[in-house]
Design a protein with these regions (language model features):
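Extended, folded cores of ATP/NTP-driven motor/assembly subunits in large transport
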Residues: 1-338
């Protein structure tokens, strides 16, 4: 019996490490449903909501503070059992702008003024995005035993997410399965001018799967940092952020680059008790480092109250973070920025 279990374990390990044999197998989801629920390996089910921008940069300082506070409350909605991802996609637009200018003609003497104003607005739109179409998405997921269990839970989370966006004054729309497939298709076919052609009724008629409609000709991941999708090359970068605070302009300045790219923030909320315990442990470690530095100072014959600036900064930041977690109901997040 023990031998059989060992053999089964080896087979499972081999299955996990087995390389994909096709472009379709490389795409890491199990099933996409018409209502937008996507099943991932490991029993994780996700949904995606597309949302639009908010006029944060041009708002007054008071309004910016209110927007920032509302966004912080929005992020605090997600607990440790609800991982989520923010995706920002910049792609070159080959079709008409998503923003349309429609000033109808009237039976008066001002049609020439209307035409001039319409032309000016269209030029402003064209110059503002440099042909780059910028889209924003939030994807959230829950573990579940099956689609029947996952669907109502995801619908409740989706309603809460959209309600939070509404309170922020941000237009948003849930994405169904076709919309999510179209987004994946655009990501895997950069520069493609052909529209995404797909219908759910084609699945039983053709015997194809959803991945067959979105997969490129090939994937090539043989290089350490570069990759190839079809005929296009891409690269993946990550940010190692050492600053204790970040400017609220960081993400905006990255997304304003005149380039096709995808920026993702993979966010996992840390359990509140675990976060507090972690910070207390860090504070204890910093305290030990202070004692060690003071001992060194005494042995060297100089003032033990003079500590390295970095140590003072770390101590202050850790104390402030602990106060935020304990008294202000803030949350700690694990963030991967790619």
């Amino acid at each position: 019996m023990r031998k059989a279990n060992q053999t089964s374990g080896r087979k499972t390990a081999k299955a996990k490490n087995r390389a994909a044999l096709s472009a379709q197998q490389t795409i890491p989801y199990v099933a996409m449903h018409p209502d937008g629920v996507c099943k991932l390996p490991g029993g994780l089910y996700t949904k995606t909501v597309e949302y639009e921008d908010i006029n944060y940069s041009v708002a007054s300082t008071e309004d910016q503070t209110a927007i920032f506070g509302g966004w912080s409350s929005f992020l605090n909605y997600f607990d440790s059992s609800l991982p989520f991802q923010l995706s920002f996609v910049n792609r070159r637009s080959h079709s008409r702008s998503r923003y349309k200018v429609n000033i109808p003609q009237a039976d008066d003497d001002f049609n020439s003024v209307r035409e001039e104003f319409t032309g000016m607005l269209k030029n402003q739109i064209a110059r503002s995005n440099n042909g780059i179409e910028r889209s924003k998405y939030i994807t959230f997921g829950i573990p579940a035993g099956g689609i029947v269990e996952a669907r109502p839970r995801l619908e409740r989370v989706e309603a809460d997410v959209m309600g939070n966006f509404k309170r922020l004054g941000v237009p948003c729309e849930p994405m169904d399965g076709r919309a999510r497939l179209a987004l994946l298709h655009s990501q895997m076919h950069p520069g493609n001018r052909e529209p995404f052609r797909f219908s759910w009724k084609d699945i039983p008629q053709t015997g194809l799967g959803t991945k067959d409609y979105i997969a490129p000709d090939s994937f090539d991941f043989r290089h350490s940092r570069l990759f190839r999708v079809g005929q296009y090359w891409g690269a993946v970068s990550y940010l190692q952020i050492l600053a204790s605070e970040l400017s609220d302009k960081l993400l905006a300045e990255i997304l304003e680059l005149d380039a096709e790219m995808t920026v993702t923030l993979h966010i996992q909320t840390v359990d509140q008790l675990k976060a507090i315990k972690t910070i207390k442990g860090k504070i204890s470690d910093i305290g030990k480092m202070k004692v060690e530095e003071q001992r060194k100072a005494v042995r060297a014959g100089y003032d033990p109250d003079i500590l390295p600036p970095d140590l003072i900064t770390f101590s202050k930041d850790a104390a402030e973070l602990l106060a935020d977690l304990q008294s202000r109901n803030e949350r700690m997040f694990l963030l991967t920025f790619t």
